[in-house]
Each structure stands twice: as structure tokens, then as C-alpha cells.
């Protein structure tokens, strides 16, 4: 183990963040790398603070010596007005989930998109990317779609129950990636879309413990499809289980969660995290939750 002298104080700002696994992943990786690394959840609900207080919290974090903050709902857009600099990809997405505090300046990044991109590259390195169907065009869905197009997807069919949001998101993404086609679709079109698709990406709450079930008719899955889910509580969603049973290559939601954490760790410390080690720890944490549930 290294005898590094560096110490880091970081935090997670958002509603209901106390159960988050992110602090545990960061602190364990810091320990292994020989850092003094403390990661504190800052739960707005417990503090009785609105999302609009994020600017004040940034200033307080600076005064108290924080090196950076992760930002989650409802502050990913609200934080934008309080930053000195925003990374180009985060600016395009209109959302920041990681802020580095250095020399009194606040710089915003988005590791939602980079975390999924890293997960896709490591977990499904040989995935065909000609045509992909994505379910969900909300905040996380926007970042994932951006990552897919950055990775080289040529035709992205974006499906969301909110037709207006879906159309707006598709138009934005098409403007950023003129060499790819991005089309807003409806769930009614899935029986026609899936036979043409190489892969399926799921970015809605369906499958979470509080929203059980599958996000589409699972009979539409074929063994030739690859399937990615961003839900990780539980890690084996109904979609993930059925896709594996059909012989699909599968990327579970834990991959993106670890990818986000590893990239944020790098931004905060300047050191590369060991993503495989972080995933092993993440799976330990999830398994422990399932035992106590």
C-alpha cells in the first residue's frame, strides 16, 4: 500500500441520498490506494433544504475544505448557474453530477454519460452498434443516449411514454450527432423496432424494487440482442434475468453505477480507480442489502 499523504473530502448532494452506495465505493477505493478519503452524504430532505440551495451548499463546501461534490436529483440542472466552468459534454447535456472545487473555482462534469460509456466499452466490447432501441428519455436516459451516440451508434430509436419530451430529446441529440439518426418512437412501435435492433438499453424506473416488472414485452427479445439496464436495485431485474435466460449478452445496471463512481474518483483525485475492484465491492454491498432486505 502507498504511503500517500493526500487527503480528500468529498460529498453527495441531493434528495434521499443516505442509502447511496457511492460513498462506500469511493472510500474503499481511497483506502486501497492509501488515501485519506472521506465521502459524506448531504441529504437535502434530512436537512430540510430545497434543491435551489445547491449554490449556497457549494460555497459552504468550499469554505469547509471540500475537494468536490457529486450532485444528484433535484440539483443536476439547478447547479449549472453556480459553476465557473462546465465541461463541454456536461454543457451539451444540460446537467452536471460532479463538481470539482479547486482554487475557489467550481467546475462541473457529467459522469452519467461517461460512466455508461465506460460500462459499455468494458462490459460489451463487441456489441454491434448499428441500430439500438432505448427505453426512456429522461435525465439518465439523455446521458445514456449521448454515450451511445458517442460510442458510434448509427441509428438510435428513442422510446418514451412522454411523446413531447422524447421528440425534444431526439432533436437535440440529432443536432449534436449529425452523422447518426435519432428518432423519437412510441412503445406501440416496439414490435416493429426490435427485429431490426442490435441492442436494447433500458433507462426507466421499471424494474426497481419500488417499480417491479418489465419495461417491454419480453417475448420481443432474441438471443442475438445485447441488453443493457441501468437499474441496479435489484441488480438482477426481470429484464436482466430474462435476457440472460434467452442467451443475450447483458450489461447490468451496476456497471454504469461503478463507471460513474470510478470516473468521479478520477476527477476528484487525479488518480485512476480500479473499476474491476470497485465493481467487486459494489456487488458485495448489493448482496449485503439483499440479505438484510
Curated annotation (Swiss-Prot):
CDD domains reported for this sequence: NAD_bind_Shikimate_DH
Chemical reaction(s) catalysed: shikimate + NADP(+) = 3-dehydroshikimate + NADPH + H(+)
Biological role stated in the UniProt entry: Involved in the biosynthesis of the chorismate, which leads to the biosynthesis of aromatic amino acids. Catalyzes the reversible NADPH linked reduction of 3-dehydroshikimate (DHSA) to yield shikimate (SA).
Pfam families: SDH_C (PF18317), Shikimate_dh_N (PF08501)
Recorded metabolic or biological pathway in which this protein acts: Metabolic intermediate biosynthesis; chorismate biosynthesis; chorismate from D-erythrose 4-phosphate and phosphoenolpyruvate: step 4/7
One GO term describing the cellular component: cytosol
Gene designation: aroE
EC number(s) reported in the record: 1.1.1.25
Listed name of the protein: Shikimate dehydrogenase (NADP(+))
Enzyme active site: 76 (proton acceptor)
Gene Ontology MF terms in the entry: NADP binding; shikimate 3-dehydrogenase (NADP+) activity
Domain of life: Bacteria
PANTHER family associated with the record: BIFUNCTIONAL 3-DEHYDROQUINATE DEHYDRATASE_SHIKIMATE DEHYDROGENASE, CHLOROPLASTIC, SHIKIMATE DEHYDROGENASE
Organism of provenance: Arthrobacter sp. (strain FB24)
